[in-house]
Amino acid sequence: MASPRELDEESPVYLVVSGIPAVLRSAQLRSYFSQFREQRGGGFLCFHYRHRPERGPPQASPEAARAGPDPAAEDPVLAQAPASDARAVRARGSAAAQTRTCCCVVSVRGAAQAQRLLRMYSGRRWLDSQGTWLPGRCLIRRLRLPTEVSDLGSFPFKTRKELQSRRAENEAFTLADLKQLPELNPPVLMPNGNVGTPLRVFLELIRSCRLPPRIITQLQLQFPKTGSSRRYGNVPFLYEDSETVEQEEHVYTAEGEEIPQGSCSEDPAAGSFDEPEDEGQQQEEEEESGSEEDDDRGEEWERHEALHEDVTGQERTTERLFEEEIELKWEKGGSGLVFYTDAQFWQEEEGDFDEQTADDWDVDMSVYYDRDGGDKDARDSVQMRLERRLREGQEDGSVLGGQVGTFERHTKGIGRKVMERQGWAEGQGLGSRCSGVPEALDGDGQHPRCKRGLGYHGEKLQPFRQLKRPRRTGLGLISTIYDEPLPQDQGETLLRRQPPTSMKFRTDMTFVKGSSCALDRPEPE
């Protein structure tokens, strides 16, 4: 049989969460109370938010005192009205001046969980899902029934005045009335309410195919990524004779925003006036920190890797072989081979110390990231590499693949928009009959065979002409799918080069698939 203390710890405790802004929905409240809801061995017994409006006590403001006397005292009609109607008029006036808030009755298991809920959330500021502060604070109070306060049951005898009164017999709010509230009777699919039901319950319903998809959308459920629970790695080591220092518990939302702690005596209106100053100070700090950050397209390590071979010393490409005709002394039993591996020779080839350690900070590297970036020297260097690759047949620079109007990147496409409104499409000529030239003409300014004077840019290349491959006189090899080079062995591109680990010397062997006609050909009889 359980002791009375254990029963008191397991008995449900009812609390009232008040001051909830009307703009908050159940999905935002799930994010706000996620840390308490998802804890192991605890959480809410029931938290079903139904947007129940609350009516705060009337507060006399100095503006109302200076406004004049009570209108009910001056107007005889309001003076003759019942007291309940007068209170309703005052309540409507005060509600219009204040922000409308809601409340909700919740239940937790035991007094320890109730104290933990009060310690974590009572008096903290409200936050939405984006981490924005909302007016008001979270107020949590324990709900005590009249029978719990007096520790007495209902008195069986009544006086004559009580018998003649028209008041209801069940006017006192009892525990049975409390359990009939819609906040404590959630749907079957949400046993702990739309706010208090943990994610593991919804996961079980999804596994059993019993959860409607609309609930996931309404509550904005975000399930964690599947993976190890790390239940064995998160166990702390218990040292002997160790004293634990109690620290203030930080409360976070589901998005990782920390819920600020503050006393209820602080004026939220005064805090709202300080926000623009804080935003300006934060913007100045961001500008100062942004000046120190390195936002260049070519980082320092990328430059070092591009200018030096084997920067990590893992590929061992520094040990190169160099053969030279030298006088070789006969060695009995020797191989007769000499590999010249003098490191001093290669250090002299690399230059002095300044040349070896230079990172070329004066060179504009933006041309390797942006086609129109860089200075003239960098663009000319890329153009020279492009022409050399075109001569060697390594680059396919056909003019037919270019797009019309690449200059419109600088004009924001204004000319294209105007022509498209008139019915023009890409690839068509101008005019009502589309008889114009669809492609722009290159104005060289001189005869193409004239290789002197103003306007001469160098050798005129024919990028659309493919070079003929020389016929091989070797043996005919049967190719396989494994002869095709891997993606990391495709060779260098115009703006990027392959790492030293890629295969540079290999025989190109194109794989030719067998045709079905050759297989289906009938054999001669």
UniProtKB/Swiss-Prot annotation:
One of its GO terms (biological process) is positive regulation of DNA-templated transcription. It comes from Mus musculus. It comes from the Eukaryota. The gene is Gpatch3. Pfam families: G-patch. Keywords: Cytoplasm, Nucleus. GO terms for molecular function: nucleic acid binding. Residues 274-299 have a biased composition (Acidic residues). The lineage of its organism: Eukaryota, Metazoa, Chordata, Craniata, Vertebrata. Transmembrane segments: none annotated. This is G patch domain-containing protein 3. Signal peptide: none annotated. InterPro entries: G_patch_dom (IPR000467), GPATCH3 (IPR040341). Residues 411-459 form the G-patch domain. Residues 54-85, 246-317 are annotated as: Disordered. Disulfide bonds: none annotated. Interacts with mitochondrial MAVS; the interaction is markedly increased upon viral infection.
